[in-house]
C-alpha cells in the first residue's frame, strides 16, 4: 500500500468520538451526542472521503476499535485497491469501501445508517493549474472532482451535531478551506501547522471543524520530531 505523509498525519491526528466530549461547552449534551453518533449496533461511524488506498480509513479503524469506518472514492481502481487492502487487514469486519460520490451521500440513497461523528478528508488542492497528463493523478490532485465548498457543505449536512470534520491542506490553501467551512456553518476548533524542518515555514496544515462555536487550539508539528514520532508511532514498523 502506498503510504503518504499527508494521509498518515491526518489519520493519526483526526479525532474520534472518544475525544469529542472534552469540550466543556458540550458536556451537558454528552449522552445525547453519544447516541446520535452511533448506529443500530452501538458503533460510531467515521467517514473517509476520497479514501484512495484506504490508508486513512484503516488508521481510523485501528485507533477507534468500536467504530464502523466507511471509505468512499469516485475512482474505481482506487476503490478496488482499497478493498483489497482492507481485506488483508485485521479490520475487514469494520471497514467498508464504496465506489461513491460524496455529493450523493446527502440523498435518500445514502449508505450511511446514521450520521457520522467524524469525517476525514485529504482533499484535492490544485485549482488553477494545468491538468496533469495522468488522468488519475489529475483526479487526485485537482479540486474539480471535490471542491472545498462541496466538501464543507456536504460535511455540514451529514455530520452529527457534535461531529467533527478533519482535513489536511497546503498552507496556502488554509484561508480558502477555512472560508468555505465557515460559510457552511462550521467553526475551527483545532489547527496544527506542519513543518518539514524547524527552520522552514509550514507546508501543510491540519484543520478540524465543528458545528458549534469554539476557541481553536493552535499547535505546530515538525516532521521527524519527537512529537511527530509520538503521534505516528502506532503506524510505522
Stretches found by the model and what they are:
Residues 3, 145-202:
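Conserved Class I SAM-dependent methyltransferase catalytic core
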Residues 10, 122, 151, 209:
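Residue-level signal for inorganic ion chemistry
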Residues 12-18, 42-109, 116-133:
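Conserved SAM/SAH cofactor-binding pocket of Class I
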Residues 198-237:
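SAM/dcSAM-binding transferase cores
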